[in-house]
Amino acid sequence: MTYLLATGVDPHPLCDANFFFHQLLSGVDVAIPSHASTPSQRRVFNLAKQMQNYMYLVGDAQARECVAVDAVYDPAGVVAAAEKLGCNVTAAIATHFHYDHIGHNGQSFGGPGMPLPGLRHFIELGLPVYIHASELAVAAQQISAQAEQLSPLGDGDEVSVGSVRLRVVHTPGHSPGSILLIAITDDGQQRLALSGDTVFPGSCGRLDLPGSSVDAMYSSLQTKVAALDDELPLFPGHAYGGPSSTIGREKASGFLRPSITLGSWRKMMAR
């Protein structure tokens, strides 16, 4: 991918001639507080640095097209980062509806108390925007959009960008509509998984929020995520525990351990 190297930004090690991937950390790679142009933007960018969100660009290197995943706080900066790397953003996907993954109008219940740019930016660009069907209505309200401006996703659905497919795995627990995305190239190879707030290295997303479910998370982790290939790279929604892991590593020492029973899981989460 010489066109990526020509930008002065090194491509991610998982990139090759056909597969494009880039990880962005909020407050460091985008939404950088020192780059804020207004006091309100500085507040947003300071929150971004505090929350340590990972955002992702995934797509087809040959077509030079990618999907933005969980692009919030500075969606224009995410689009600019993709363009700097030689790719055009053609769609956006959210792994779940929480404000730090889709943005917020600053008024709806459960927000940060200020407007946050996010999915609405991609709607205004005329791009398709995807979220799990169970969270579509509340997400639309949260970002002051019409429901028909969002596209629903369900378990097993795929979003294509060039020859790359992002397959949806519904993983309720952190939220009712949380999803994991598996990137698959046209040779059928599963290249990586984006786990949102379902799996972090050594842990999982919070289960004390409205709509969270301890039992649903256990089922998602032990029956869906743990069933994936041990070698599959895993990239989380926040820098809580590190930038990446693998399914096998989480089965050995994380919350995918097969020794965790439902009873022991409930006790762990009740602490």
Description of each model-found segment:
Residues 46-48, 150, 170-172:
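Short Gly/Pro-enriched turn/cap motifs at secondary-structure boundaries
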Residues 21, 68, 90, 130, ...:
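Structural detector of well-ordered beta-strand residues that form the stable sheet scaffold
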Residues 64, 158, 165, 170, ...:
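Metallo-beta-lactamase
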Residues 2-19, 23, 105-111, 126-127, ...:
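Binuclear metal-dependent hydrolase catalytic cores
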Residues 58, 95, 171:
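Conserved S/T- and glycine-rich ATP-binding loop of Class I adenylate-forming
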Residues 1-66, 71-85, 123, 271:
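Zn-dependent metallo-beta-lactamase
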Residues 51-52, 66, 73-165, 184:
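Active-site HxH/HxHxD metal-binding segment of metal-dependent hydrolases
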Residues 31, 99, 138-139, 242-244:
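Generic structural signal for helix capping and beta-alpha/helix-loop junctions
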